[in-house]
Amino acid sequence: METFVASGLRLEDTELARFLTAHGYPCLDALHACAAAQPERFWREVEQALGLRWATPYQRVCDLARGPAWPRWFAGGELDLHDNLVGRIACEDPQRPALLWEGDDGSVRVHDYAALDDEVRRLATGLAGLGVRSGDRVAMYLPMVPEAAVVLLACARLGAIGLPLFSGYGADAVASRLQDSGAKLLVCADGYLRRGRQVDMLGEARRAAERAPALEAMVVVARLGGGRWPEHGAAHWRETAYRDLVERSAPRQGAAPHAADAPLMILYTSGTTGRPKGVVHTHAGFPLKAAQDMMMAFDVKPRDRIGWITDMGWMMGPWLVFGGLLRGATLMLFEGTPDHPRPDRLWQLAGRHRLTHLGLSPTLARLLMAEGEAGLPAPGALDALRVFGSTGEPWNEAPWRWLFERVGEGRRPIINYSGGTEIGGGILACFAGLPQKPCGFAGPIPGMVADVVDGAGQRLRTPAAGESDGGNGADAGVGELVLRAPWPGMAAGFWQDEARYVDAYWSRFPGLWVHGDWARIDADGHWFIEGRSDDTLKIAGKRVGPAEYESALVGHPLVKEAVAIGVPDPVKGETAVCFVTLAARGAAAATAEGWAASERALRAHVAERLGKPLAPARVHCTAALPRTRNGKILRRLVRAAYLGQALGDLTSLEDPAALDAIRACAEPAGAVA
């Protein structure tokens, strides 16, 4: 596979190169070796490079008395996160922009570091006045508005545990998380704008609050009301306007140190069954991991401007806040959708705010690519942009090349980034200034002692240079992605459920974190994620990732998007069934009469690329694919809907009607949605 090096960024000019030079490492491989062999030295150097200020120095970098599943990082140390993230820059460079916000309607707000410092201190005072104490859980049900960042930071200052929730959740999802966490207070918005329409949040929040007996207060951000929210008595909680609370509270000065391993935040991530998992992160670990990844992989420097299309209820929202502010950067928060009111809205946003870093999903790139010329930026719109970021799902080659070549003009690297909520950041990444392959990763982020193992937990052999990797065969290095050592950003367990955490990640192979992804390493040392290990198909004994099918289909001119699942087959054991949405030129093929010929053509197209034994049994045409609001296609739900199985947790689903289209495909006689 062809290797690319973005022309606009040299390795020697990056923060990674500066770190290597400052600490005497001749190359990145030497840094990886040190991180594996001397983790205490490595992580001490990282925290010092990030400039962490300790109120009480730590006694030990990592205490493993309870084993690798339960490390205590920076044991004995205390730090004031507010001082590290906001306070020191508010003193040294008060007018540096900290938060930029653009609403769906184009309205803009700016907080410099001094204003952010003042508002965080005021809100912390106000929350304390409402009874919030260290260790209490404070939930936030907010769109991407500046107040979302302020709430996270105010909780950190108080030692309260922040609980960011996805803004698209309904009352049931919010209630289950309030109940599980025992949240004392909820900060919510009255609503937000999406594609020019008002979306209610306060009604959903109140319905959820009725089922959360531990909740004592609700603070309401008037995003839509445009004025002050009147205090409102309710069944067992009281309501207060956010703006009133901030304005009547003093910006209390002084330090606010907390233990390095004190809980900072609970991030909920959905499981396929059972209740959502509350992933606990700590005061030192999560900000350090986020900022380290920004420094080493993304080349984020102080005063850079970072935007990421995400939600505060997903890991990348808090990652942006804690990592970006620790790097002294300016954060861009965007309320709207990146293709409204025009397909080039995202590029306009990046240009208007002079973003240096922009994060987006592969799905968004595919959608914009399908718009043709209308999905491209205007000349000069991205002049300030140095780096693209991407996470959340695997790439297909065609949209990757479109983003790199057509949008990025070959000058801007795409930092592919794979990790997860439980990781607190990334396991694998590309690195600014280093070669990259479409859809792949240059390797593990330093400190992540990653490996690929077989079903017995044994390391898989990587093909030698010049040796064929055999495509994607089981003996060519495709196996489970594991981690052989702990790291500061790792989950400090699941909220009040230690056994479930150990079972999820540490129970399969002794001493190894099993992440649940299939991965492979090619002969050049580049890494590739082949999908979730529970998504992988095994057809007549041949293991193949769904991304293989999806990449082949998206490469056909009829297809806009694709998803592949495995279904039971009496002969092969399992066979592939695919679902596609159509590009503009394929719309005429969507009729029942025209689709039969198009389906045959697409099956042949896949067979030509993957081999006849791996040809999909069916390729269905559907109007939409089930996805989250941040663009991730939900294969689990596609498979469950198609097979008529229980759907499980639907809280992250954007459009439930998409599941009806999938169910229709399963009807007799090959009905087409």
Give residue spans per PLM region:
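AMP-binding/adenylate-forming catalytic domain of the ANL superfamily
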Residues: 217-222, 608-633, 645-672
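AMP-binding/adenylate-forming catalytic core of the ANL superfamily
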Residues: 140, 165-191, 205, 351, ...
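Conserved ATP/PPi-binding loop(s) of AMP-dependent carboxylate-activating enzymes
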Residues: 444-445, 458-505, 544, 647
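Structural core segment of the AMP-binding/adenylate-forming
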Residues: 153, 157-244, 361-362
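Gly/Ser/Thr-rich phosphate-binding loop
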Residues: 306, 326-329, 355-360, 369-438, ...
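Conserved AMP-binding/adenylate-forming core of the ANL superfamily
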Residues: 30-34, 82-83, 95, 99-153, ...
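Conserved AMP-binding/adenylation subdomain of ANL enzymes
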Residues: 287-305, 315-357, 370-372, 376
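Conserved pre-ATP/AMP-binding loop-to-beta segment of ANL
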Residues: 95-97, 219-220, 233-268, 275, ...
